[in-house]
Amino acid sequence: MALDSAIKLEIISKFARGEKDTGSPEVQVALLSRRISDLTEHLKVNVKDHASRLGLLKLVAQRKHLLKYLKKTDYAKYSELISTLGIRDR
């Protein structure tokens, strides 16, 4: 399930470091978090959709790795990001 372009641009503009930044870890984590929440809502309705469940697990793992990298390189941005997105600190 892809994100709508308007939603994607809104998330990118909110978390981007610069004007044309789309690849920083903060932006990637924010986009993944939105996709994860959308997939979670989808799976509440479609309980037997196991392919989407596997996709969700892959997205969560990817976000976990990006958060680990961000925590290691810039802890201040990491703590700000998880508080903004409402993600637990592990």
Curated annotation (Swiss-Prot):
GO molecular function, one term: rRNA binding
Gene3D superfamilies tied to this protein: 6.10.250.3130, S15/NS1, RNA-binding (1.10.287.10)
Any Gene Ontology biological process: translation
Keyword vocabulary terms for this entry: Ribonucleoprotein, Ribosomal protein, RNA-binding, rRNA-binding
Family as reported in the entry's similarity comment: Belongs to the universal ribosomal protein uS15 family.
Assembly mode: Part of the 30S ribosomal subunit. Forms a bridge to the 50S subunit in the 70S ribosome, contacting the 23S rRNA.
Superkingdom: Bacteria
Organism of derivation: Wolinella succinogenes (strain ATCC 29543 / DSM 1740 / CCUG 13145 / JCM 31913 / LMG 7466 / NCTC 11488 / FDC 602W) (Vibrio succinogenes)
Listed name of the protein: Small ribosomal subunit protein uS15
Listed InterPro entries: Ribosomal_uS15, Ribosomal_uS15_bac-type, uS15_NS1_RNA-bd_sf
SMART domains: Ribosomal_S15 (SM01387)
Pfam families per record: Ribosomal_S15
Entry function: One of the primary rRNA binding proteins, it binds directly to 16S rRNA where it helps nucleate assembly of the platform of the 30S subunit by binding and bridging several RNA helices of the 16S rRNA. Forms an intersubunit bridge (bridge B4) with the 23S rRNA of the 50S subunit in the ribosome.
Entry annotated with the keyword Ribonucleoprotein: yes
Keyword Ribosomal protein recorded: yes
One Gene Ontology CC term in the entry: cytosolic small ribosomal subunit
PROSITE patterns xref list: RIBOSOMAL_S15
